[in-house]
Structures are given as C-alpha cells and as structure tokens.
A protein has these predicted regions:
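Intrinsically disordered, low-complexity, mixed-charge
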Residues: 1-92
Length: 92
C-alpha cells in the first residue's frame, strides 16, 4: 500500500474539547502513527503517517472534529514519509 505523511493544522474551537484525545483514538483505530498537540495560537497541530487511505480518513475526520469542537479551517501539508513513529502520541 502507498504510504503518506501529512502535517495538519486545525483552527476553531479545538482546544479543551477532547479533540486531541478523540484524534488519538481514531488514529489507533486506523493504524495511523504520529502525534497531535495544542499550539499557543489556539490551533491543533498533528503529524499523521500511514496508508494513504487511512490518513485521508483521519484528515476528513479533522474537518468534522470531536463532538464538542467547532472546526473552522484545516490546513494540510504533504511531507515526505519517514516511518519514524512507533505509536500515536498526544504531546503536551
């Protein structure tokens, strides 16, 4: 399968609404590796690596967000696949 790596920035009401935790659950369900963290400007940043179809599922989920979030914008940057991760972490 084709592998993909993306870095995403999610803007909106995405902090304090369990967005990172929900993304981690989805990532684990789909076998995606990487990390997610809050940024000081109120956005959430994540790096996702895995099968292209599964990464795309998570990117689409980020447009909808967790139950209490309100996503305004999702910026997606394609990056070179590195296979550097062994799990999916919430960074603090």
């Amino acid at each position: 399968m084709t592998k993909q790596r993306v870095r995403i920035f999610v803007k909106g009401k995405v902090q304090g609404v369990f967005f990172r935790q929900a993304l981690k659950v989805k990532a684990i369900q789909h076998g995606i590796l990487g990390w997610v963290k809050n940024l000081n400007d109120g956005r959430v940043e994540a790096v996702l690596e895995g099968d292209i179809e599964k990464v795309n599922i998570l990117v689409e989920w980020c447009h909808a967000g967790s139950a209490n979030s309100r996503v305004e914008d999702v910026e997606i940057r394609n990056e070179k696949f590195t296979n550097e991760f062994s799990n999916f972490d919430v960074l603090y």
